[in-house]
Amino acid sequence: MAIKLINIGFGNIVSANRLVAIVSPESAPIKRIIQEARDRGMLIDATYGRRTRAVIITDSDHVILSAVQPETVAHRLASKAEEEDINEGEE
């Protein structure tokens, strides 16, 4: 299994294999998840001081804040998966 990396903005990259969810930060439950992660020391802020537009939850219970829209991150993830499928077909 190859390691797939996804750009989440400003040169920050996460492993696509570790992603569980990409969600919007607007709802109260997500805000609660962010605060709990901050309290546990499991929050990674990759916004560079900009507004949080996507919250990425990983399989290790880390919560990553990104200034990129969730749809953009999902599109990058989908295009990486599609690219991998094409490469496997060439082998």
Curated annotation (Swiss-Prot):
Tree of life domain: Bacteria
Residue ranges the record marks as coiled coil: none
Cited InterPro entries: RemA-like (IPR007169)
PANTHER family: REGULATORY PROTEIN SSL2874-RELATED, REGULATORY PROTEIN TM_1690-RELATED
Family per similarity comment: Belongs to the RemA family.
Protein name stated in the entry: Putative regulatory protein CBO2514/CLC_2370
Organism this protein belongs to: Clostridium botulinum (strain Hall / ATCC 3502 / NCTC 13319 / Type A)
